[in-house]
Amino acid sequence: MATVSTNEFKGGLKIMLDNEPCVILENEYVKPGKGQAFNRVRIRKLLTGKVLEKTFKSGDTAEVADVVDIDLDYLYNDGEFYHFMNNSTFEQLAADAKAVGENAKWLVENNTCMLTLWNGNPIAVTPPNFVELEVTETDPGVKGDTQGTGGKPATLSTGAVVRVPLFVQIGEVIKVDTRSAEYVGRVK
């Protein structure tokens, strides 16, 4: 199995830690005035989603995780599994709710998502960075109400709740950033 040294650590690198695939979120190289240099690393375990901090001595090595990232189109949810399809081979994969996690509210049919596979099984689903969803429920925007420019909450067609500007009405389609759950703009 391939190994990677601590001086090659960077955000997004997938490594094995305690026989479990993990992704490096942040890597900080620390060189104290006295003693050996080390790397302080924030890691997210891909199976559980748990984030932890670990310290590696300078020169340590870690095994590269044997995970594959593939782009698949989201098809549907049958209540137990979320189904995805490869557009070139038409092969279908089913991911359980644990693999999808909080990202279920951003899954829109026929949108391309990135699935992380480990031993052929999906362990993580990443939706596209931006999705277009219809506003199904929100308070009406009253003309002249400019006090408190924080906006108002709006429920979208997938059940996600996002803060939107006062002018957004029910039935409009808006663009949302899935990484921060923020309103980006209206879709024309």
Swiss-Prot record:
Q: Which UniProt keywords apply?
A: Cytoplasm, Elongation factor, Hydroxylation, Protein biosynthesis
| Post-translational modifications reported in the UniProt record | May be beta-lysylated on the epsilon-amino group of Lys-34 by the combined action of EpmA and EpmB, and then hydroxylated on the C5 position of the same residue by EpmC (if this protein is present). Lysylation is critical for the stimulatory effect of EF-P on peptide-bond formation. The lysylation moiety may extend toward the peptidyltransferase center and stabilize the terminal 3-CCA end of the tRNA. Hydroxylation of the C5 position on Lys-34 may allow additional potential stabilizing hydrogen-bond interactions with the P-tRNA.
- InterPro entries in alphabetical order: Elong-fact-P_C, NA-bd_OB-fold, Rib_uL2_dom2, Transl_elong_fac_P/YeiP, Transl_elong_KOW-like, Transl_elong_P/YeiP_cen, Transl_elong_P/YeiP_CS, Transl_elongation_fac_P
> Which Gene Ontology terms of cellular component type are present?
cytoplasm
| Modified sites of kind N6-(3,6-diaminohexanoyl)-5-hydroxylysine | 34
Q: Which Pfam families match?
A: EFP, EFP_N, Elong-fact-P_C
Q: What is its main location?
A: cytoplasm
Question: Pathway, per UniProt?
Answer: Protein biosynthesis; polypeptide chain elongation
An example of a GO molecular function for this protein is: translation elongation factor activity
Q: Where in the cell is it found?
A: Cytoplasm
Q: Which GO terms describe its biological process?
A: peptide biosynthetic process
Family indicated by similarity: Belongs to the elongation factor P family.
Q: What PANTHER family is this protein classified in? A: ELONGATION FACTOR P, ELONGATION FACTOR P (EF-P) FAMILY PROTEIN
Function, as annotated, reads:
Involved in peptide bond synthesis. Alleviates ribosome stalling that occurs when 3 or more consecutive Pro residues or the sequence PPG is present in a protein, possibly by augmenting the peptidyl transferase activity of the ribosome. Modification of Lys-34 is required for alleviation.
**Would you tell me the protein name for this molecule?**
Elongation factor P
Provenance organism:
Vibrio cholerae serotype O1 (strain ATCC 39315 / El Tor Inaba N16961)
Q: Which gene encodes it?
A: efp
